[in-house]
């Protein structure tokens, strides 16, 4: 498997996940002068109207300092209580990690080890007339434009990766408000990275509250397989067009689908390939992965190598009604398109067909096929 960095997947922060349980650490990091907050409004981040960058709140900007001084000290008193719930407070807050190697004076001692860096938090603003915090507490950022996909794909991978991490945690906090075991309100603990049932009545059984560990109190990530289909010499690549429209352009891409319970990555790939295209493929290699914050997927990028025998490679779209078209394309044609690609959300291919742009794992998988084809040709030529 490749360790190449994908968009949204850059290692930016040391998450120091073992420190989230320390209330002292969270209090100190929330209130430190160097701390940075990435604000979201109703689940979406903001773009600076001045320079188009992802908005990050810190005390170095006066208007942002006014916001932080109004909310952070009060929110700190709500930590690990039901009053911190966004329905009551008007905000969700989650600790993202420490940006190491900065000139921040933040320092925390834990087990005789010193942890240093700039603390980063995600902040989702969901204020109403009845919440503790009000809209006026967050002026002027309520007038800022919200991030669109077009915006985020123009950001640096560092900022996009911070955005992705914050968005996934905050989306989860916003969606899961009540305990599936007893219906009581859930409230965030461990700096917004875990949810806890608020039911204190021990006469009421709750399999969430009483379990030593369970999977509803932690953030969820949905594993999704995405596969570039090729043949044994990489001279062909199967690309498909979904019936879903993506703007006013024609997009052909790789095969993708959610994994199902009790399914291996390889079996999920084999199933998705057959269900969507009718192609029989048994040879699956895992290539690389990409976080995808829409809303909380982990794209597991794979290569499917089809043994052509006039049967395996035959396309049949009649199983699943998801695709509009699927075709085997010559890899040489794709290479020509990638060679001309100058960046952007999509790659012009042939006729009116476009391929996914470089911020997607689909692009990297398609490029992986092309590079394997070129390398195989070089090896063959060297033996002549």
UniProtKB/Swiss-Prot annotation:
It holds the Pfam family NUDIX. It catalyses: a 5'-end NAD(+)-phospho-ribonucleoside in mRNA + H2O = a 5'-end phospho-adenosine-phospho-ribonucleoside in mRNA + beta-nicotinamide D-ribonucleotide + 2 H(+); NAD(+) + H2O = beta-nicotinamide D-ribonucleotide + AMP + 2 H(+); NADH + H2O = reduced beta-nicotinamide D-ribonucleotide + AMP + 2 H(+). Its EC number is 3.6.1.-, 3.6.1.22. Residues 219-351 form the Nudix hydrolase domain. Substrate binds at residues 256-258, 272, 276, 322. Mg(2+) 1 binds at residues 256, 276, 322. Mg(2+) 2 binds at residue 272. Zn(2+) binds at residues 179, 182, 197, 206. A motif (Microbody targeting signal) lies at residues 378-380. The keyword Magnesium applies. SUPFAM superfamilies: Nudix (SSF55811). Belongs to the Nudix hydrolase family. NudC subfamily. Present with 846 molecules/cell in log phase SD medium. mRNA decapping enzyme that specifically removes the nicotinamide adenine dinucleotide (NAD) cap from a subset of mRNAs by hydrolyzing the diphosphate linkage to produce nicotinamide mononucleotide (NMN) and 5' monophosphate mRNA. The NAD-cap is present at the 5'-end of some RNAs; in contrast to the canonical N7 methylguanosine (m7G) cap, the NAD cap promotes mRNA decay. Mediates the hydrolysis of some nucleoside diphosphate derivatives. PANTHER family: NAD-CAPPED RNA HYDROLASE NUDT12, NUDIX HYDROLASE, NUDC SUBFAMILY. This is NAD-capped RNA hydrolase NPY1.
């Amino acid at each position: 498997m490749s360790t190449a960095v994908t968009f949204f997947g850059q290692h930016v922060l040391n998450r120091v996940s073992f420190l989230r349980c320390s209330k002292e650490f969270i209090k100190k990091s929330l209130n430190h002068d160097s701390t940075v907050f990435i604000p979201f409004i109703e689940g979406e981040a903001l773009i600076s109207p001045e320079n188009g960058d992802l908005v990050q709140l810190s005390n170095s900007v006066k208007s942002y300092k006014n916001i932080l001084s109004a909310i952070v000290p009060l929110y700190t008193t709500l930590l690990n209580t039901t009053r911190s719930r966004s329905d009551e407070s008007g905000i969700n807050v989650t600790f993202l990690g420490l940006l190491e190697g900065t000139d921040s004076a933040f320092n925390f001692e834990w087990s005789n080890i010193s942890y240093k860096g700039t603390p980063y938090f995600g902040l989702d603003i969901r204020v109403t007339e009845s919440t503790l915090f009000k809209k006026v507490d967050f002026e002027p950022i309520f007038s800022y434009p919200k991030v669109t996909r077009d915006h985020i794909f123009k950001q640096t991978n560092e900022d996009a990766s911070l955005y992705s991490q914050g968005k996934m945690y905050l989306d989860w906090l916003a969606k899961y408000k009540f305990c599936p075991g007893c219906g009581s309100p859930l409230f965030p603990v461990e700096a917004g990275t875990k949810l806890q049932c608020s039911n204190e009545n021990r006469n009421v059984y709750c399999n969430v509250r009483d379990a030593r560990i369970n999977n509803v109190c932690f953030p969820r990530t949905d594993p999704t397989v995405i596969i570039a289909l090729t043949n044994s010499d990489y001279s062909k690549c199967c690309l498909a067009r979904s019936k879903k429209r993506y703007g006013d352009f024609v997009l052909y891409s790789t095969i993708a689908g959610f994994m199902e319970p009790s399914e291996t990555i390889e079996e999920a790939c084999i199933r998705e390939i057959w269900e969507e295209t009718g192609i029989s493929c048994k040879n699956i290699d895992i290539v690389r992965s990409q976080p995808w914050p829409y809303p909380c997927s982990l794209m597991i990028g794979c290569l499917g190598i089809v043994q052509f025998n006039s049967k395996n490679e035959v396309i049949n779209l009649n199983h699943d009604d998801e695709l509009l078209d699927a075709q085997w394309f010559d890899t040489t044609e794709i290479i020509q398109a990638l060679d001309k690609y100058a960046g952007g959300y999509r790659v012009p291919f042939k006729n009116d067909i476009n391929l996914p742009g470089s911020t997607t794992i689909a692009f990297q998988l398609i490029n992986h096929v092309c590079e394997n084809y070129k390398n195989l040709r070089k090896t063959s030529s060297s033996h002549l």
